[in-house]
Amino acid sequence: MAKIKTRFAPSPTGYLHIGGARTALYSWLYARRHGGHFVLRIEDTDRERSTQESVNVILEGMSWLGLDYDEGPFYQTERFDRYRELTQRLLDEGLAYRCYCSKERLDALRQEQMANKQKPRYDGRCRDLTEPPEGAGEPVIRFRNPLDGEVVVEDRVRGRVVFRNSELDDLIIARADGTPTYNFTVVVDDMDMGITHVVRGDDHLNNTPRQVNLYRALGVEPPVFAHVPMILGEDGKRLSKRHGAVSVLQYRDQGYLPEAVLNYLVRLGWSHGDQEVFTLDEMVSLFDLEDINHSASTFNPQKLLWLNQQHIMRAEPAHVARYLAHHLGERDIDPADGPPLEAVVAAQQERAKTLVEMAENSLFFYRDPADYEPKAARKNLKPETEAALVRVRDLLSELEDWRPEAIHECVLKAAEVLELKLGKVAQPVRVAVSGGPVSPPIDQTLALLGKEATLRRIQAAIDWIDRQAAG
């Protein structure tokens, strides 16, 4: 049995979007599950819309997701000689022909067919020409599609789909300027690269019978096809920019872990029992094309956010720290200027929904608060709480065993002496050291900050209260 080989073949006309990333993931998983190869091909024949910037964004998105490829990236613009060679071969064998019909004639034909409630299709006028009409311009090249019979596609997702050749027209495989068309290049590339399984959106299904006929005209069996349903927004319409972030790298910038995005993408059309959270290894071992749903999936941002929280919570702190460092760097924070990043992660894993949230809540570990959150300050930094801050400062200044347990005892002792509930002491301390009302448990927070920074910040808060009171 031939080694399984799948491919992802984006057009570099924009970013790596959610739908494309899901297609790449499904192709990658199937190859990895079966010990095969995954190929990356850049379909850049549309020279007007293709940009190097888009190529870079696609490659960056693939890298961030961890979807490594065994071959490529291949570029179609580097293969024009091969397309010309096979176009000529089809012409020589009578399997393609030159079409001289003008745009005006084709437009009129289309209008007439639509007026007669017929399916618009080329009528084959040039099919049997032996020489160019007088005054004709440069021709396009059309594939001579069979006129009768059927094309049967055994689709791994949709099952058997049957197309009648009589309903297919003679598609253009090369434009008048000689550039090849999508339907031709994709067949040639998949043939030359030995692609065995093609996973793609079901909007390509109508191209499939034409491509199958092209494969056979070129003397090869077509690959196995798996057409996956589209992704819808919550309003039931096809997912687009109006539904929010659709670029993979936007989710990176918003603080999502790549494995959380992959987990969400795999669940957009595939399931395994009632399991929701999957590691990448689990996805590889469980995924199969036959298990993909037949109906469209709805993109739910809240579900993605929940999965991100689950992955942050379950990951090793060192793994999360790698990605958190990027977000801290974006905020001009050097993690070397504070407590170990892994410890900062471990203290916040249970609560953080995104790495952006974790980064924002981690800033005070690396630099003194520039000011206090107004509402938290009004409630917790006032003359009535100054005694608690002074007591905690004095107890902590004498503490040599700077561990969470010992710190907790100091805060507890201050509360007992002042006959206050623990929160009435801990919260002013929290606002004093962090600048806001939210942090990990106060003993963990102070342990991570260290003795010097803790005492300095508590004293700064005491001084701030005195200045406010003095007017």
Curated annotation (Swiss-Prot):
Zn(2+) binds at residues 99, 101, 126, 128. It is found in: Cytoplasm. Binds 1 zinc ion per subunit. One of its GO terms (cellular component) is cytosol. GO terms for biological process: glutamyl-tRNA aminoacylation. Gene3D superfamilies: 1.10.10.350, HUPs (3.40.50.620). InterPro entries: aa-tRNA-synth_I_cd-bd, aa-tRNA-synth_I_codon-bd_sub2, aa-tRNA-synth_I_CS, aa_tRNA-synth_I_cd-bd_sf, Glu-tRNA-ligase_bac/mito, Glu/Gln-tRNA-synth, Glu/Gln-tRNA-synth_Ib_cat-dom, GluQ/Sye. Its cofactor is Zn(2+). It is an enzyme of class 6 (ligase). Monomer. Catalyzes the attachment of glutamate to tRNA(Glu) in a two-step reaction: glutamate is first activated by ATP to form Glu-AMP and then transferred to the acceptor end of tRNA(Glu). Belongs to the class-I aminoacyl-tRNA synthetase family. Glutamate--tRNA ligase type 1 subfamily. This is Glutamate--tRNA ligase 1.
